[in-house]
């Protein structure tokens, strides 16, 4: 199950975004993968439109929340999902939401194992 999740393209997208967030100088690489083009498109598209996506998130946060106080992993998940919702209309909204919910479960399970 875990190795299957690690091959999930959206898990890889979030891992790439997380890596880039904390090591901005590192060069992004996209190893051979069945969904390499998808992964690359979502990662690069999310990074290119980061400010616009963050503004979209800010508009929908309640007043007592802020992006800076929200866990970074959650923000990255939201950024990638919002990118797909806005810029990849060929994928159904239901599929995007379901896939990112599953992706968030994977990362939650990983963080609980490390406690």
Predicted regions and their residues:
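N-terminal interaction/assembly modules
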Residues: 1-115
């Amino acid at each position: 199950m875990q190795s299957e999740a690690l091959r999930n393209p959206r898990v890889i997208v979030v891992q790439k975004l997380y890596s880039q967030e904390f090591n901005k100088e590192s060069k992004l690489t996209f190893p051979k993968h069945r969904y390499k083009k998808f992964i690359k498109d979502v990662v690069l598209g999310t990074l290119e439109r980061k400010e616009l996506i963050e503004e979209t998130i800010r508009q929908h946060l309640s007043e007592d929340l802020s992006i800076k106080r929200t866990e970074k992993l959650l923000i990255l998940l939201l950024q990638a999902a919002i990118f797909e919702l806005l810029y990849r209309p060929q994928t159904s909204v239901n599929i995007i939401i379901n896939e990112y919910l599953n992706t968030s479960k994977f990362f939650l399970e990983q963080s609980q194992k490390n406690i």
